[in-house]
From Swiss-Prot:
This is 5,7-dihydroxy-2-methylchromone synthase. The active site is at C174. The record marks M207 as: Determines the polyketide chain length and product specificity. The modification Cysteine sulfinic acid (-SO2H) is found at C174. Its EC number is 2.3.1.216. It catalyses: 5 malonyl-CoA + 4 H(+) = 5,7-dihydroxy-2-methyl-4H-chromen-4-one + 5 CO2 + 5 CoA + H2O. It comes from the Eukaryota. Optimum pH is 6.0-8.0.
Length: 403
């Protein structure tokens, strides 16, 4: 009988196996789907709804301040998975600090994978291949932590095969739309034939609470965040005539800006998610973003452009001030952030799902205008995620010709 060592492959055979396991090409975005809840809230009347729902109408001056905050956001409307009648069932959620985590979990644990599944179904339909061909699922959310986790529940709702490789990314915040693309690139390029379904789904009820004069940070968050989900199909070596790749994911980098963990931070408590934001966050991000951009270009041997206007842009719309200051710092023309500002106006800040919406907005408008590429007619672009840490995700994209 042969020994175990004699039956195993030689080192050169192992290298051959390794080479065969890897894809030949770069990971690409092949399909995009989005979904949002049915309840729409216009921003210009949101202060009335919010103060009424939280029994806070007697706080007249605070309401005026909140209304002013809402009107400065450059948000037109947002979507939520609740309305006023729904909130009446949960008085602890609409208080400021009553224990309410159980109620919030009861809403988010089933709601997050359900909303994510809606977006995933649209992405799979656009992709055009059977869902049985999905090999990996990456699910991302900042709410509804549970076991089995949201990736398991989404796979179950979609009816994916039992051997799909699943990953769940919890509690990363607003930069996570970039994080999931970084994960998906590694999975697609290191597993020949892999097709990665990426799902980001967010429900903001985890941080909804009554206004409080001593915690205006939370009120700012409540004026910005909206509910939504985005899904992408990512894979290498697209099948010609079947799959329609739009963007190549050329390089991904994550950077933590030193000594900034107190600038944006959130904490899960019995009262839900508590949100804290420094006034200096837009400046901190804008002062560091160019270094992140230069790093991602140099890491692949490309000289950074002298004029950042030569690129298309997918920045996370963390808020008007962040977009304004990054735009100014990089000396970008106003139209460069058009897609991001459109998504911010139409949906608010949907945390990890936002950049998926912006990719969708950009590719649709590019097609409608008859441009040469999905990236507003340009070949090269950048996707940026900003969030707690402060963490920056920088992704170098190469847009393919419109098909």
């Amino acid at each position: 009988m042969s020994s175990l060592s004699n039956s195993l492959p030689l080192m050169e055979d192992v290298q051959g196996i390794r080479k065969a396991q890897k894809a030949d090409g770069t990971a690409t975005v092949m399909a995009i789907g989005t979904a949002h809840p049915p309840h729409i809230f216009p921003q210009d009347t949101y202060a009335d709804v919010y103060f009424r729902a939280t029994n806070s109408e007697h706080k007249v001056e605070l309401k005026k301040k909140f209304d002013h905050i809402c009107k400065k956001t450059m948000i037109g409307k947002r979507y939520f998975n609740y309305d006023e009648e729904f909130l009446k069932k949960y008085p602890n959620i609409t208080s400021y600090d009553e224990p309410s985590l159980n109620d919030r979990q009861d809403i988010c644990v089933p709601g997050v994978p359900a909303l994510g599944t809606e977006a995933a179904v649209k992405a799979i339909e656009e992709w055009g291949r059977p869902k049985s061909e999905i090999t990996h699922l990456v699910f991302c959310t900042s709410c509804g932590v549970d076991m089995p986790s949201a990736d398991f529940q989404c796979a179950k709702l979609l009816g994916l095969h039992a051997n799909v490789n699943k990953y769940c990314i919890y509690m990363q915040g607003c930069y996570a739309g970039g994080t999931v693309m970084r994960y998906a690139k590694d999975l697609a390029e290191n597993n020949r034939g892999a097709r990665v379904l990426v799902v980001c789904a967010e429900l903001t009820i985890m941080m909804l609470r009554a206004p409080n004069e001593t915690h205006l940070d939370n009120a700012i968050g409540i004026s910005l965040f909206g509910d939504g989900a985005a899904a992408l199909i990512i894979g290498s070596d697209p099948i010609i005539g079947v799959e329609k790749p739009m963007f190549e994911i050329v390089c991904t980098k994550q950077t933590v800006i030193p000594n900034t963990e107190d600038v944006i931070h959130l904490h899960l408590r019995e009262t839900g998610m508590m949100f804290y934001l420094s006034k200096g966050s837009p400046m901190t991000i804008s002062n560091n973003v160019e270094a992140c951009l230069i790093d991602v270009f140099k890491s692949v041997g490309i000289t950074p452009p002298e004029d950042w206007n030569s690129l298309f842009w997918i920045p996370h719309p963390g808020g008007r001030a962040i977009l304004d200051q990054v735009e100014a710092k990089l000396k970008l023309r106003p139209e460069k952030f058009r897609a991001a500002r459109t998504v911010l106006w139409d949906y608010g800040n949907m945390v990890s799902a936002s950049v998926g919406y912006i990719l969708d907005e950009m590719r649709r408008k590019s097609a409608a205008k008859g441009l040469e590429t999905y990236g507003e007619g340009l070949e090269w672009g950048v996707l940026l995620g900003f969030g707690p840490g402060i963490t920056v995700e920088t992704i170098l994209l190469h847009s393919l010709p419109l098909m």
